[in-house]
Amino acid sequence: MERAAKKEAVESLNGLFQTTSVAVVAHYSGLTVAQMQKLRSQMKQAGASVKVSKNRLAKIALEGTDVVAIGSLLKGPTVIATSSDPVAAPKVAVEFAKANEKFVILGGSMGKTVLNVDGVKALASLPSLDELRGKLVGLLVAPATKIAQLTTAPAAKVARVVQAYASKSEAA
């Protein structure tokens, strides 16, 4: 790799690390091309990305970013999964690691917090941002529907009483 290409790669990686909120580092030695493509497509569907780069260049690119702590994990054939959603990359990485034993999660970083393997798995078990938003909307809408039911219930009861009284007087 030429010096200019290395500089461009470092700048590209640094831009990626500046905008990410979570990074997961894993070994990928022994995975086939098809498995790597599957990992990339799963990450893309989840809104995350996967990068394979020289560890030395990645360490340089990490300087000055929030996820600088993952530099110590960059040894051997590593892949870095990043996402702006704190749950997307860890969730896909953990699911992929369960299906492919050659994909070994080393750890990661969420902001300036370093995560070990258990931390990445714990982060992956959390609901996604969209799921949390859905639950929040459900909680906000539930009281409104209850109020609507309570306000219409007395009117419905009065209508049934009047209907029963009317049918009783017709029968008499």
Curated annotation (Swiss-Prot):
GO terms for molecular function: large ribosomal subunit rRNA binding; structural constituent of ribosome. GO terms for biological process: translation. Keywords: Ribonucleoprotein, Ribosomal protein, RNA-binding, rRNA-binding. PROSITE patterns: RIBOSOMAL_L10 (PS01109). It holds the Pfam family Ribosomal_L10. CDD domains: Ribosomal_L10. InterPro entries: Ribosomal_uL10, Ribosomal_uL10-like_sf, Ribosomal_uL10_bac, Ribosomal_uL10_bac_type, Ribosomal_uL10_CS_bac. It comes from the Bacteria. GO terms for cellular component: large ribosomal subunit. Forms part of the ribosomal stalk, playing a central role in the interaction of the ribosome with GTP-bound translation factors. NCBIfam families: PRK00099.1-1 (NF000955). Part of the ribosomal stalk of the 50S ribosomal subunit. The N-terminus interacts with L11 and the large rRNA to form the base of the stalk. The C-terminus forms an elongated spine to which L12 dimers bind in a sequential fashion forming a multimeric L10(L12)X complex. Belongs to the universal ribosomal protein uL10 family. This is Large ribosomal subunit protein uL10.
